[in-house]
Amino acid sequence: MDKVKIQEIAEEAGLSNGELIEKAKELGFNVKAANSAISMDDAGILVDFAISGTLPKGFKKPGEKPKLKVVKKKTVEKEPETIVEAPVIEKETAPEKTEVIPEETENTVEESTAAETVESEPETAVIEEIETPAETAKEETVEAAPVVKEVKQRKGISVVSKKAESEAEKGTEIEKPKRRTLSRTGIKIVRKAKPAPVRAATRISMGSGAPTPPSKKKVKKGPAEARETGKKIDIFNHDSMSGDIDSGFGEEEVVLLDFSDKNIYEDMMRQEQKRREEAKKREAANGGPAKGRQPFRPQQRRSLKRGGKRKKYTKEESSEVITSVEIPENVRVYEFAEKVNRSVGEVVKVLFALGMMVTKNDFLSKDEIEILAEEFGVEVSTMNPLDELDYVQAYDEVEDTHLEERPPVITIMGHVDHGKTSLLDKIRSAKVADKEAGGITQHVGAYQVEKNGKKITFVDTPGHEAFTEMRARGAQATDIVIIVVAADDGVMPQTKEAIAHTKAAGVPMIIAMNKMDKESANPDNIKSQLAEIDVMAADWGGEYEFVPVSAHTGLGIDDLLETILLQAEMMELKADPTRKAKAVVVESSVEKGFGPVANVIIKNGTLHVGDNVIVGTTYGRIKAIKLDDGSAVKEIGPSTPAAIVGLNEVPGAGEALVAMDTDKEVRELAEKRAEYDRAKQLSKSTKASLDDLSALIAEGQLKSLPVIIKADVQGSLEAIKGSLEKLRNEEVKVNIIHEGVGGVTESDVTLADASEHAVILGFNVRPTGSVKKKAKELGVEVRTYTIIYDLLDDVKALLGGMMSPVIKEEVTGQAEVRETFVVGKVGTIAGCKVSDGVITRNSKARLIRDGVVVYESKISSLKRFNEDAREVKNGYECGIMLENFNDIKEGDVIETFKDVEEQVTL
């Protein structure tokens, strides 16, 4: 017979060697150490005993006399005798005398009290099969009711057959329930099927009064019946009793605990409680329930072969071969492995072989995904999860049914100071340019005018180089672009940039040649300059209209408007006002009393007060709509510019706005988009190549100026941020630690104080009294500006002060060596005449011979007429001795100089 060591059993069962040796000694096995071996059968008994505290029925310790298993047989139906069986007991307990009675096939057994037999109708019996272990009840489990176990000197276990006594048959006739023959043997329980679970407090007694002593009738001893392994189940598991009663259990003997003796029940409950406490202590000592610590099963014994490896239970992997897979753009190593049905180890191994050090949680780059796809023979296609969250695409997929003509949206673009806003003012008869600081536009403004009964929407963009993003947004949100060029100034850099934005957006373009009232105006020069960048005038055979105008006198304004309306008519601009609104955000800000405010232009549909809208990751319900003249309205139609109030945050300028049905819909979609953005930020792997590492080290060595930027509108904030990020060189840079739309707050001051040497830059915002006071207390500098030029100049000056000064050399004097004198223990003294500048003592000096620098040191001694001199001026003679140098010859030139620090600027 195969034998197995104690230590192998302990590992398999999840127990300690010491604990298992103790249990083995209790069972009487000859075990002394962890390498002691026992048979496979004994191993199964030992593990069952160590884990559940139970022993197989009929188990005898080595050297113990075998005990007979007592099998009870039911009496003939007419025999009014109660059969009592004694359990298999330990050697200390003498077995009770039993009597064997021949079995009859049609007998049924029923659990009931004496009172139930007389007073109630017979109930259908439920049969369960259990195994009755021969161990003490100290480790048995009680759920709904006590589990039947055989305990030392236990009394009250009885076999109840159908009673034939006269008192049981008075007034009632017991109906025999039908049974199916059970193919397996075991101990069965017959009890009444009950509709609801009955707890341990339920009376299960054999009489209606005081506890009755167990029956003293003798039964004959019979040969022990062979015991087959059966399934252990809870005999009081009422859930399993609620199904089909006739579930395959045959008519066999029935063993029940006689709970009429309360001492038995109480003793069982005490032992059960003790067992549970011990189990909890073991779990606590092991740091929680031991994984895999299950009762030892016979089928597990196969893995306990002596000298062999333990069987490893591995998760069965699918053998499905994947040839094509769709993965998100940002995918981790383990996610890719799952998609292609490979292990993480295989994926990491391939990348490791190519010199890529990755872990399972690292994100894969596009190149790495291509390499892996080729290696595993999988066709990989990437998908953008944001496509599912694209509310604009979902809006566009719905067909417009009631199309109507809409006003054109015109964007005015061009170089700074070329008269864009003044031209728009003339059209609107307003004075917007006067209100802008410095006379330059620093915001995107949208206005609507009427010409010949038709409305035209104008969008004004800044011309300053810092406002590139604003011009790009203006081109995207428009139908026609007007490029304003000053006739006296010609084509400038921002003019070319505006034309590039317009062409990129695929928008029609009209050239307005402004300032035609000036004598220096030269329209032909403009046409020739624009022709060089493929913008050919219509009268030169091109496709672009050139309209001469003057914002000062009003010359050509009507011609310009008619050209716009003609172009719009050719474009057949239409929209469906019956649909929900779709708009584009041209500017956003925070206004006191209103919160986040977005300036939008409706592209399609109608926007109403109360509509639920989404703008990128921002959402809200429209609370108010204000037109460009300040009037409030309830709704606005296509191509109408307006300011809306009611969003939860300041939206990004250039974002698309779409109205939806419910608040829940917009909120969930916005939150999902925000979550995606966060995940995208996290997708940037922290792994860095050697080149990246060098760049990071160099970046860390840069001196930085920490700044906090606060602006009145989102567009200006973006412009300032973009300009400041460009202010850097190999030594200094601007570190933007915080940015926001709105006024300077106390929290901004606190943040600046926490950041060393941080400066708060406010654009078109002013700090309040309390903020000023706190800034003064904490020593935080708050600088406010209304013109972007001034802000950038100040930051440049601050960065210049942080840069290391440039060391320049300034020559202070020259002296020619006329004669040399050698003095013992002193050195060589050069007799010189100062030919230029002033020679000073202790100044730096270099010896030049035939135009070549021979030595560089400093003047250690300067004398005139044997007296020490502090300096010798041009034309005078003197004696000079250089420090640590004596090889001076006649004709040499001694030149003195000093280092001068010069502050640099960006």
From Swiss-Prot:
Residues 460-463 are annotated as: G3. Residues 414-421 are annotated as: G1. Keywords: Cytoplasm, GTP-binding, Initiation factor, Nucleotide-binding, Protein biosynthesis. Residues 439-443 are annotated as: G2. It is found in: Cytoplasm. Residues 514-517 are annotated as: G4. CDD domains: IF2_eIF5B, IF2_mtIF2_II, mtIF2_IVc. GO terms for molecular function: GTP binding; GTPase activity; translation initiation factor activity. Residues 550-552 are annotated as: G5. It comes from the Bacteria. One of its GO terms (cellular component) is cytosol. GTP binds at residues 414-421, 460-464, 514-517. Its main location: cytoplasm. Gene3D superfamilies: 1.10.10.2480, P-loop containing nucleotide triphosphate hydrolases, Translation factors, Translation initiation factor IF- 2, domain 3. Residues 299-313 have a biased composition (Basic residues). Residues 405-574 form the tr-type G domain. Residues 165-176, 222-232, 270-284 have a biased composition (Basic and acidic residues). Residues 94-125, 165-232, 270-321 are annotated as: Disordered. One of the essential components for the initiation of protein synthesis. Protects formylmethionyl-tRNA from spontaneous hydrolysis and promotes its binding to the 30S ribosomal subunits. Also involved in the hydrolysis of GTP during the formation of the 70S ribosomal complex. Belongs to the TRAFAC class translation factor GTPase superfamily. Classic translation factor GTPase family. IF-2 subfamily. This is Translation initiation factor IF-2. The gene is infB.
